Regions:
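Short hydrophobic short-linear motifs embedded
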Residues: 158-166
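Residues within helix-turn-helix
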Residues: 25, 124, 135
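A short pre-motif secondary-structure segment
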Residues: 112-116
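DNA-recognition helix of helix-turn-helix
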Residues: 130-154
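Arg/Lys-rich amphipathic alpha helix in sigma70-family domain 2
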Residues: 56-76, 91, 150
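Σ70-family region 2.3-2.4 aromatic/basic alpha-helix that recognizes the −10 promoter
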Residues: 32-39, 48-68, 141, 145
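A short, charge-rich alpha-helical start-of-domain segment used by transcription regulators
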Residues: 1-15, 25-28
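Acidic, proline/glycine-rich intrinsically disordered inter-domain spacer in sigma factors
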Residues: 68-69, 78-103
Length: 166
């Protein structure tokens, strides 16, 4: 593996970081921290899937940052475009709805959906990145896809349905 192999992964890292953080500036900082950590620990990486290793580093950094209080405020991030849109207004609305629905997923489901569906990682690699068993990846993916379907169809009830149990 070479530095060029790492550089080739930057677009995927940026996309995943943006989906995790929801903010372009924080995403770029997360990617930079990930690359800095990867280059500093280069000697620890053996053979294997470079993408999964980089995503593992990013995931761990993100979790650590989420646990600690945010000290830096990023003003002006709201002026940045959310996602690139295709030409038609209808497509832009569908993309916006999808991004909104994706953001409403629980974090555990959103991470798995992004890594498997968007970043094309295998279940095994996704499990390594997140530090969970493969079965957990599969169940989170199934629940996440179902929840996305419900959200996108708009069939989710406004109020939770309660069942009377006797």
């Amino acid at each position: 593996m070479s530095r060029q192999d790492i550089v080739a992964e930057i677009p995927r890292l940026r996309r995943y970081a943006r989906a995790l953080t929801g903010e372009a500036v924080r995403a770029d900082d997360l990617v930079q921290d990930t690359l800095e950590r990867a280059l500093g620990k280069w000697s620890l990486w053996g053979s294997g899937n470079l993408r999964a290793w980089l995503f593992s580093i990013m995931h761990n950094l993100y979790v650590n940052q989420a646990r600690s209080p945010r000290l830096v405020d990023y003003p002006g991030d709201e002026a940045l475009p959310d996602l690139p849109a295709r030409a038609t207004q209808n497509d832009a609305l569908e993309l916006r709805d999808f991004a909104h629905s994706l953001s409403r997923l629980p974090e555990e489901q959103r991470e798995v959906v992004l890594l498997v569906a968007l970043e094309d990682l295998s279940y095994g690699d996704t499990a390594k990145v997140l530090g969970v068993p493969v079965g957990t990846v599969m169940s989170r993916l199934s629940r996440g896809r179902e929840r996305l379907r419900v959200l996108l169809e708009g069939s989710e009830p406004d109020e939770p349905q309660l069942k009377v149990v006797k």
